[in-house]
Design a protein with these regions (language model features):
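Bacterial N-terminal signal peptides that target proteins for export
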Residues: 1-11
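A residue-level marker of the well-folded mature domains of exported/periplasmic proteins
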Residues: 3, 24-360
Length: 360
């Protein structure tokens, strides 16, 4: 009897530990799935996500496919992460349709999903709790404003007999952020042209990739062409091929400006112009505006080969994605966060409020 009593006394602490362990809060795990790793932009997003994870004491993983053309590898990453029973997921989807099954599973399992960067457009209702992203449409509009101001004399002087072309160069026609930028640049440029009093929509035509041509987009004008170009794939070599094709017809089509809507298309132009050094010599007077940052783009802007660029705040995008995920896990109300965008050029890129946004 004493032996059983002694055994019982020994079991009590063990049972108590088991009860306490079962009552311990589940460790918060948030996988952060980006669109790729081919651009330094994503490394800066990662740094922001890791900072938020440290602040809240949560575990995250940060992963993405090799390039932004690799849709299926990203789908598999999401499948694998959902099998680990995450507390929430932060996702920048390459293709919402490709992850529709996983989004519906997340709804059933009550796993909050936070979109970031391009987010998860057209997701099922209730799947996405909030999104941390730049307002890409408005950001590209800033680029159009600066390009118009720089080229105003050439644009207002354009006629059917002496037309001009402005290229709207986009990495793909599927990503929400990229397509929003392409459309934002297109629309703001049209608005500025119509406001100059010299031209109407009847003088403008938008050509190129059909994803960027809306039913109300002017397509028949002969004085000013906005040419929307998209490479065969988002991979860097294809962006370079497309960039070279654009540059080959600068003289024939009287291309006076090129807007590159992300780091990928910027790389294409830089690869085709010896990091921009050939621009002033071979294409004098042509304005080039970029997007985001990166060592080579920054150098091209500092040297005035590029007019300037639009910078996002990739660190804040990553931080806010994890911040929103944590708050959603805790049952707090969350809402979309506009992480901001700013214009910079050789005269402003060293200002503290700009310099902190410009990654290498």
């Amino acid at each position: 009897m004493k032996r059983f009593r002694r055994l019982g006394l020994l079991l009590i602490p063990a049972l108590a530990l088991m009860v306490l362990a079962s009552c311990a809060p589940k460790k918060i795990y948030i996988p952060v799935i980006s669109k790729g790793f081919q651009h330094q932009f994503w490394q800066t997003v990662k740094a922001g996500a890791e900072a938020a994870a440290k602040q809240y004491g949560v575990t995250i993983t940060f992963e993405g496919p090799p390039t932004e053309a690799d849709i299926q590898p990203q789908v598999q990453m999401l499948v694998n992460d959902m099998a680990k029973n995450p507390s929430a997921i932060a996702l920048a989807a390459l293709d919402t349709n490709a992850v529709m099954d996983q989004l519906n599973q997340a709804i059933k399992r009550k796993i909050p999903i936070i979109g970031f960067d391009s987010g998860v457009p057209n997701a099922p209702a209730g799947a996405i709790y909030a999104t941390a992203a730049t307002n890409s449409y408005n950001a590209a509009g800033i680029a159009a404003d600066h390009m118009y101001d720089a080229l105003k004399d050439k644009i207002t002087a354009a006629t059917a007999a002496h037309p001009v072309t402005i290229v709207d160069f986009n990495q793909d026609a599927t990503s929400q952020s990229v397509t929003d930028r392409g459309k934002g640049f297109r629309d703001e440029m049209i608005k500025k042209i119509e406001a100059d009093g010299k031209h109407t929509a009847d003088d403008i035509r938008v050509i190129g990739n059909p994803a960027f041509i809306a039913p109300d987009t002017p397509t028949k004008g002969k004085a000013i062409t906005i040419d929307v170009q998209v490479p065969a794939t988002p991979k860097d070599p294809d962006s370079a091929v497309s960039a070279q094709a654009i540059l080959n017809r600068v003289k024939k089509d009287n291309i006076i400006g090129i807007f590159c809507s992300n780091e990928g298309t910027v790389k294409g132009i830089l690869a085709s112009t010896a990091d921009g050094t050939a621009l002033p010599k071979n294409y004098p007077g042509m304005a080039v505006i970029g997007f985001d940052a990166g060592k080579n783009q920054k150098a091209a802007i500092r040297a005035k080969y590029f007019m300037g660029a639009i910078t996002q705040d990739p660190y804040n995008i990553g931080f806010q994605a994890v911040d929103l995920a944590y708050k959603a896990i805790k049952g707090q109300s969350v809402a979309n966060v506009d992480t901001g965008a700013k214009w910079y050029d050789s005269t402003t890129m060293d200002q503290p409020d700009i310099a902190r946004l410009l990654y290498d």
